[in-house]
Amino acid sequence: MLVLVLGDLHIPHRCNSLPAKFKKLLVPGKIQHILCTGNLCTKESYDYLKTLAGDVHIVRGDFDENLNYPEQKVVTVGQFKIGLIHGHQVIPWGDMASLALLQRQFDVDILISGHTHKFEAFEHENKFYINPGSATGAYNALETNIIPSFVLMDIQASTVVTYVYQLIGDDVKVERIEYKKS
């Protein structure tokens, strides 16, 4: 089962669109679920995601126009409970102790958060944490040179194989990270 994880598009305020090389990789009919950390900013970005998969889950970012998106969400995909939050609520941004607290509050196997615009994936106390970064490479308050990235999770029974796609220069680099539920 393929799950696309992305966020912080900031279209059209900070970027015009997804990188063309990412659009070529993201084709309709291949992905079953989309988990988005927010800051899509417009309905057009949401409509684009709906063309890729029927099951789209979005949480509200601090720049989203649509106030109907929830602040947080817990989704079950296969054997995994996945928590989804934008991340502007985590202080300081990306703080491990704050993320671990949220993971325990949500009681999830995987916690997905964004806001920092920087990709991260790691295991902590037998739980898995993912920050997909910014799919467009949009700048943030602290940095202008952001590497565009998104994540594809391949969920098979009690294992998640995470593929990280990063646009470095003109090349899409892919890294593979495996997490087994204990």
UniProtKB/Swiss-Prot annotation:
Keyword Transmembrane carried by entry: no
InterPro entries to which the protein is assigned, alphabetical: Calcineurin-like_PHP_lpxH (IPR024654), Metallo-depent_PP-like (IPR029052), Phosphodiesterase_MJ0936/Vps29 (IPR000979), Vps29 (IPR028661)
Annotated protein name in UniProt: Vacuolar protein sorting-associated protein 29
Known role: Component of the commander complex that is essential for endosomal recycling of transmembrane cargos; the commander complex is composed of the CCC subcomplex and the retriever subcomplex. Component of the retriever complex, which is a heterotrimeric complex related to retromer cargo-selective complex (CSC) and essential for retromer-independent retrieval and recycling of numerous cargos such as integrin alpha-5/beta-1 (ITGA5:ITGB1). Component of the retromer cargo-selective complex (CSC).
Consequence of changing V90D: Decreases interaction with VPS35
Keyword presence, Secreted: no
Self-association and partners: Component of the commander complex consisting of the CCC subcomplex and the retriever subcomplex. Component of the heterotrimeric retriever complex formed by VPS26C, VPS29 and VPS35L; within the complex interacts with VPS35L. Component of the heterotrimeric retromer cargo-selective complex (CSC), also described as vacuolar protein sorting subcomplex (VPS) formed by VPS26 (VPS26A or VPS26B), VPS29 and VPS35. The CSC has a highly elongated structure with VPS26 and VPS29 binding independently at opposite distal ends of VPS35 as central platform.
Keywords: Acetylation, Cytoplasm, Endosome, Membrane, Metal-binding, Protein transport, Transport, Zinc
Organism encoding this protein: Mus musculus
Subcellular location: Cytoplasm; Membrane; Endosome membrane
GO function terms (MF aspect): metal ion binding
GO cellular component: cytosol; endosome membrane; retromer complex; retromer, cargo-selective complex
Residues annotated with N6-acetyllysine modification: K50
Similarity comment text for this entry: Belongs to the VPS29 family.
